[in-house]
């Protein structure tokens, strides 16, 4: 398994020629990280990191439902992604497709897993691409730096939810 040089607190690995594995610990309970991951108004607070503003965050959280995020980057261009949910286990696991609308032929399947120990959450994202070329293009896009920023923002949003959602919140 190859490791990428990570600049933030998420660890990025390349387990196979078609996969990207991202692991990040959060100082927040998993139901809070999950809530921030699936809630459109919260997604708008973290998904773009420091790179722009999320103008669209749509989530139809059900198997067969869709999601779509659009960000207007600081340099003025628009970046959009969408996908379809394939599996949902509230507070535990989400499997969905992911399509960058700039290259719609490069669909990936993301498996997002939330685990908790001692009040801390480990988020694991396995991105499965159809071929090595798509995986390599994903890496070359600069995704790692933006993802690191987004994960930092996600942690802040999840921590901010502690007083609002102190129970076990589902989907």
List the predicted regions and their residue ranges.
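A short, structured loop/turn motif at beta-sheet edges
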Residues: 30-31, 60-62, 86-93, 113-122
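Beta-strand/loop substructures that line and gate deep hydrophobic ligand-binding cavities in soluble
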Residues: 19, 95-148
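A conserved amphipathic terminal alpha-helix motif
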Residues: 1-6, 129-171
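Hydrophobic pocket/interface hotspot
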Residues: 33-34, 43, 67-69, 85, ...
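Hydrophobic ligand-binding cavity/cleft-lining segments
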Residues: 1-52, 171
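Short beta-edge strand/loop motif at the mouth of beta-sheet-based domains
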Residues: 21-22, 41-78, 167-170
């Amino acid at each position: 398994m190859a490791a990428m040089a990570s600049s933030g607190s998420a660890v990025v690995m390349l387990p196979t020629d078609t996969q990207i594995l991202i692991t990040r610990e959060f100082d927040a309970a998993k139901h809070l990280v999950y809530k921030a991951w699936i809630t459109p108004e919260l997604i708008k607070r973290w998904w773009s990191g420091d790179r722009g503003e999320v103008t669209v965050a749509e989530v139809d959280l059900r198997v067969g439902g869709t999601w779509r995020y659009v960000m207007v980057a600081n340099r003025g261009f628009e970046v959009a992604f969408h996908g379809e949910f394939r599996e949902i286990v509230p507070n535990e696991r989400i499997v969905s497709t992911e399509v960058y609308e700039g290259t719609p032929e490069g669909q990936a399947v993301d498996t997002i897993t939330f685990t908790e120990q001692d009040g801390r959450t480990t988020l694991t994202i396995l991105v499965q691409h159809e071929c090595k070329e798509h995986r390599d293009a994903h890496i070359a896009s600069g995704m790692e730096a933006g993802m690191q920023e987004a994960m930092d923002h996600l942690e802040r949003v999840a921590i901010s939810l502690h007083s609002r959602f102190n129970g076990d919140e589902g989907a």
